[in-house]
Amino acid sequence: MTIMRKSHPLFKIVNHAFIDLPTPPNISGLWNFGSLLGMCLILQILTGLFLAMHYTSDTLTAFSSVTHICRDVNYGWLIRYMHANGASLFFICLYIHIARGIYYGSYLYKETWNVGILLLFLTMATAFVGYVLPWGQMSFWGATVITNLLSAIPYVGQDLVEWIWGGFSVDKATLTRFFAFHFILPFIIAALAMVHLLFLHETGSNNPLGIVSDYDKIPFHPYYTVKDFLGVILLLLMFLTLVLFFPDKLGDPDNYMPANPLNTPPHIKPEWYFLFAYAILRSIPNKLGGVIALVLSILILALLPYLHTSNQRSMTFRPLSQSLFWVLISDLFLLTWIGGQPVEPPFIIIGQLASILYFLIILILMPIAGLIENKLLKW
């Protein structure tokens, strides 16, 4: 008699995905972040569901309802702070996951990579509309500034902005539809994550050496279930430390003031995880140019499979590419810092140089480094 997990139509799917899945024996802790992202998504959906039970998406009561959650609902403060800081945790895992994909050449699995880019865009959209919901000062002005960027699109721009706003400014209609988007998008993300996994299991996982490991595989369970569980424990430990001791560390103090269309905050900026893109947007003194640069800063990831010139997949044995990779990471940290600074010298020129370097490394320097390394291998 066959084991139930191998014969039952439903359990069979789970078995092939998480139990008997053949996995390379040498994948490092950096491969944990896929499962950690799954954990983050579940955490966000659950906490978000409980918040939605008490939240009201009306401009007059939204801010008060969030205050009510924190003050009057049982453990409401905990749920609210877990949800708010859970977004930061999500993006930390997301950025490490992408960085690992770039470092080890995982982008050569084109379908998996492209679905991943779509997931990134959807996650960014979800985080953006979610940030508007508390209806604080930064929520309101962030929504106004970012949605207004669409007006840079020739011919249809202004109509598009008014269509998204549901009127002639960010108001009740905008808040209601943003709440609807924020509720539905995570479920679309969950469905796409399944597609992401489906494409990954078609090819099998990559590994740190970037070589074919078909002849040497081990089952996912118990080896990697235990390893993933360790990652979950460590991440939850750090997460709960942040939530319980420093809940407002990553937030903006301006968002504790109710939205006021007549009073602009001194410095409008998004959450920390969007600052690098915001710095790239601001580095071009032209509205349309800035919007194009902003979109390209993420969309450029789709070009990576076509810009891969090296004979080796992974950067493990490629010192030139490694150096450029770490310069790119440093550049992103620099852009994140610049995004949080006011638009004044010397920050303007630093932001412009960092933005140029970002595109230069990905589009020109990394492919050249790959070609040089190919030559060095022949010597």
Curated annotation (Swiss-Prot):
Cofactor binding note of this UniProt entry: Binds 2 heme b groups non-covalently.
Regions crossing the membrane: 33-53, 77-98, 113-133, 178-198, 226-246, 288-308, 320-340, 347-367
SUPFAM superfamilies: a domain/subunit of cytochrome bc1 complex (Ubiquinol-cytochrome c reductase) (SSF81648), Transmembrane di-heme cytochromes (SSF81342)
A matching Pfam family: Cytochrome_B
Chain sites annotated for binding heme b b566: H97, H196
BP-aspect Gene Ontology terms: mitochondrial electron transport, ubiquinol to cytochrome c
Binding positions for a ubiquinone per the UniProt entry: H201
Keywords: Electron transport, Heme, Iron, Membrane, Metal-binding, Mitochondrion, Mitochondrion inner membrane, Respiratory chain, Transmembrane, Transmembrane helix, Transport, Ubiquinone
Cofactors (names): heme b
Disulfide bonds: none
Chief localization: mitochondrion
Cell compartments where the protein resides: Mitochondrion inner membrane
GO CC annotation terms, alphabetical: mitochondrial inner membrane; respiratory chain complex III
Topology relative to the membrane: Multi-pass membrane protein
CDD domains: cytochrome_b_C, Cytochrome_b_N
Residues noted as binding heme b b562 in the record, renumbered to the chain: H83, H182
Any one GO MF annotation of this record: metal ion binding
Family note: Belongs to the cytochrome b family.
Miscellaneous: Heme 1 (or BL or b562) is low-potential and absorbs at about 562 nm, and heme 2 (or BH or b566) is high-potential and absorbs at about 566 nm.
Function: Component of the ubiquinol-cytochrome c reductase complex (complex III or cytochrome b-c1 complex) that is part of the mitochondrial respiratory chain. The b-c1 complex mediates electron transfer from ubiquinol to cytochrome c. Contributes to the generation of a proton gradient across the mitochondrial membrane that is then used for ATP synthesis.
Subunit structure: The cytochrome bc1 complex contains 11 subunits: 3 respiratory subunits (MT-CYB, CYC1 and UQCRFS1), 2 core proteins (UQCRC1 and UQCRC2) and 6 low-molecular weight proteins (UQCRH/QCR6, UQCRB/QCR7, UQCRQ/QCR8, UQCR10/QCR9, UQCR11/QCR10 and a cleavage product of UQCRFS1). This cytochrome bc1 complex then forms a dimer.
Name the UniProt record assigns to this protein: Cytochrome b
Organism, scientific name: Thomomys talpoides (Northern pocket gopher)
